[in-house]
Amino acid sequence: MSMIVRSLIVACAICGMDLAICPAAEAQTQDHTRGFSIARVQYDGGGDWYSDPSSLPNLMAFLTEHTTIVMAKEPARVHIDDEDLFSHPYLYLTGHGNVRLSEPQVDRLRHYLDAGGFLHADDNYGMDESFRREMKRVYPSKDFVELPADHGLFNCHFEFAHGLPKIHEHDGQRPQALALFEEDRIVVLYTFEADLGDGWEDAHIHNDPEPSRLAALQMGTNIVVWALTH
């Protein structure tokens, strides 16, 4: 996806314009994803890429209610090898286990990110080692940088004075928002030791306190807004 086409898709979504009347955007958008859709990455390696199934529908519903972004009816699902990868400006990856990319997938993901795409990876406890390994293959010369609490991502829509919130108290480590940059643009955001996806899930699944669920949804909103406007 070129930066121009990505910008058209984003502008149509944020301004409330139907993608059907934005020809360049429509050409890059499947019929079932009219409006902005978060695309879940289906990856190889044995990890449960499909975990937290109610998380993205709930986050997208929250975005519809609390932003002016025109949202699709449901999230998408994409494999790095899929022809329509470049029609999705925003990828989401999560799971508890091993993440593995083939060499062609490494090259293709790098091309996607360099062309203006964005990847949000949410640590669901168990994928950390393999995800960091694969990102080092994608960008051998880049290292994750922790975003400070005063970074604009934490106040672009909702205010998070202390940075990334801790949603699921799995092992007591502090949450970190880690980023890979291409110049000044975040191309990969890795939310580590936070487990935002658990907070996006239906309330009865993890029994997270309501303030934690709200914080997770608000943080997810900030990430989407930041990715689409930067």
Name each model feature, range by range.
Residues 7-20:
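Bacterial N-terminal signal peptides
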